Amino acid sequence: MTDVMKYTWTNTVGGIELKFEDIATSNTVPFVFGELRSDYYGLEQIQLSKDDIVLDIGANVGMFSIYVKKKFGCRVIAFEPVLSNFEQFKSNILMNDLLLSDIELHNTAITDIENDEIRIGMPLDNTGGSSVFYHMNTMSVCKTETIDKYITEGCTYLKIDCEGGEYAIIPTILDKLNMFKYIGIEYHKYLSVQDPVALHNLLDSNFNGKIFYKEYGT
């Protein structure tokens, strides 16, 4: 995406001014601004400290992670599989007066398989729509990791927005869910076998904390 036109969006969420650059044709940044302002992830309802750890699976160009870092000052570990999004995330960190070292960022796809490769379909006009369930002319190849090794003492908030990948991830960490206090998740449905209600019930029956979720199609 080296030749595409970029645009910078500026908005204030929770009293914090944020700036994010993305490709001009993508609606992802204004869409996520709307999610943050509507508090889909419950960030205005909780308190986190600098000692807390937030895991961001499906970080895109960094909106959630950067807002969390600026709002709470806690440790943020973010995972974004699409290289162009990953590079834009780094630029957005600097644009928001943070250091690259302020957020631990991994160019990797979190799945149920360690050290594999996956192909991700990339819509050219929507940086937030990349998914392994899309097969397009433009594909990104990325290594995979499992999330369990990152779930350590101090992990407080798990955010998952990975375009259908949640169905592979959640069952692998049921025994570690209660290390978190909060889970923020967006459910997707790309295949007929993917059941957002069943996945939510699985989470709800194995997790004692608070789940903030966005239903598929909303």
What are the functions of these language-model segments?
Residues 1-218:
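Phosphate/nucleotide-binding beta-alpha loop and adjacent structural elements of enzyme active sites
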